[in-house]
C-alpha cells in the first residue's frame, strides 16, 4: 500500500486505542488527552479548567499567518507546574512536621526566553520564587527581573572578578544573590572582592558527592565531576573564609546529581550524604540556613513510571516527601535548625508547557507493487518472481509455514543482491534493477501479510518491519527544535495530533529538512521500551498531516543551532480566558532567511544586488527575459522576508 493511498477506516478502531498506542494517557496526564473528534486536546490547568482542541487551535493560528512548524507555549501549564511543585512541598512539610519551608528557583539555562522567565518570576512571587544563573548574561536577566528581596538568586557556574563583584554589589539593590563557590580558585577572588568593596557576600558552597548516579548525567557526581568542591576543598574553603572573617556569610550548601534523576533511591542516598555535610558545616561554625538540592526532578517522558532513561520511578509528591523526610531525619538528631529547602527544578517546571507542531511534506516508501512480467527477463528477476509466487501460495497465518516464509525472505534478499551485482557488471539495465527492487518489496509485503499473529517470529522476519517502513519528511530541523534527540538520544513523545479515530496503517520514522544524515527522528516511546518505528497514517491529498512533539519545553529552544541555516520557528503564548476560550498573549516570529544570513555575517541586500546584476547580464545575453527576471527577483525578495521553513 502506498503512503499516498486513501486509508480504509477500521471501524472497530477507537480514539482510546490511539491513546493507548501512543501512551497519551500516561505521559500526557494531566495536560494532554484525546477527544471524541480524534484530536489531541490540551487541559492547560490540568484536572481543572477548560480544554482546547489542539487541531482547531493550530488551524486558527495558521489563519493568523503563523505557519508550521509552530511552537505553542501554554502559559497556564507553566503556572500549574509551579503551583504543583509548591503544593507538593507544602504537603510534605505538613506531613512530616518539618520546621522549615521550601523556596525554589528556576534555572534560567532551561529556557531563557523573556516571556517564560518573566512569567515564572511573576507567578512565583507569592512563594518568593527566584532564579538560578550560570553566566554573566543570565545573572543580568535574574538581577533585572527579580526585585523581591526574599527571593534567591543562585549564582552558579564559573565566576571571574566582575561576576563576583556584580553579585556582591547587587545586594545593595535589595536583591539576594547567593555566590555559590564551585571551584577552589573562586575563594580568593571572593575574599578580595569583598574586601575591596567593603561589602559582605551571601555565600554558598557546592559539594561533590560520591553518591553513584545513573544515566546520561551520572558524571555530575563523583571526584571527576565538572563542578563542586571535594571534602578537602570544602574544609580548606571554610578555613579560608574563617581567616577572612567571612565564615558568617556562608549560608547555603548546594549539590546536583543530574538534570534527570530516574531512580528515587539515588536521590535518597545523595540527600543523606549532603545532609551530613550540611550538619558538619554547622559544627565548623558556618551559620548555614539553606540546603539547595539542585535540579534533577525528572519528567516521565515515556509514561512507564520506571527507572529507565526516559522515565522516573517516582511522582512529584514522592520527590518532595523524600527531600523533606530525609533532611529532617539527618538534621534533627543534631539539634540544629532545619534548613530552608531549595530546588532548581527547571526540567520539571518547563517541559510540559510547550508543544512543537510540524507538518509532513511527503513520504518515501518501499515499492511494493507487483510489476507485470515481460517476455524476456534476466534469471535474477525470474527467481524473484518465483519467490513471490511461492509466498502468495502460503497458507495465511499458519504457524507451520513460518520456516517457509523465513526461507523465502532469505531467498529474496539473495536474489536482490545477485541483481545488484549483475547491474554493477553491466549485465542488467537500470529498469531491470528497478524491477528487482520492486519485486523484493512485493515479497516483503506479502511475507509480512502472511505472518501469524501472537507467535514468536524469527529475527530475520522481524526485520521486515524496518524494510517496509516509510520515511516521513518533516518540515523542521531537529538541530534547531530538538537537539537533544541527536546529541544524547533523548526521547520525546511524538504522535499525530489528529486522525486518532483511525487506525494507523504505516510504520515510519521522520527525516528533517537538513542535509545531514543525523537529521532524523527514529527513536520513539513504546510501552516502557524504545522502538525505532512509529505507527502513522497514510497521507491524504490536499490535507496536512500534523505531528506533535511534546514535553520538550526545557533546553531544546536554547540549545538549538542554525544547521543548514534553519532558524527558530514561529512561537505563540496561549492563555485560557475566563469564558473558556483562549487568547494569544504573545507572538514570537521565527527567524527569517534575512536574519539567519545576517547572523552568518552575510549582507542580504548585497546578495540581492549581485543576483540583480547577474540577471541584467543574462538579459543582455538573451538567456533571460525581463518577465523572468522580475519573477526571480520577486521570489528572492519574498524568501528573505519569510521564515526558513517550507511554506504550504
Swiss-Prot record:
Substrate binds at residues 291-301. It holds the Pfam family Orn_Arg_deC_N. One of its GO terms (molecular function) is metal ion binding. Disulfide bonds: none annotated. It catalyses: L-arginine + H(+) = agmatine + CO2. InterPro entries: Ala_racemase/Decarboxylase_C, Arg_decarb_HB, Arg_decarbox_C, Arg_decrbxlase, De-COase2_CS, De-COase2_N, De-COase2_pyr-phos_BS, Orn/DAP/Arg_de-COase. Its EC number is 4.1.1.19. Signal peptide: none annotated. It comes from the Bacteria. Keywords: Decarboxylase, Lyase, Magnesium, Metal-binding, Polyamine biosynthesis, Pyridoxal phosphate, Spermidine biosynthesis. One of its GO terms (biological process) is spermidine biosynthetic process. Its cofactor is Mg(2+); pyridoxal 5'-phosphate. The modification N6-(pyridoxal phosphate)lysine is found at residue 109. SUPFAM superfamilies: Alanine racemase C-terminal domain-like, PLP-binding barrel. Catalyzes the biosynthesis of agmatine from arginine. Belongs to the Orn/Lys/Arg decarboxylase class-II family. SpeA subfamily. This is Biosynthetic arginine decarboxylase. The gene is speA.
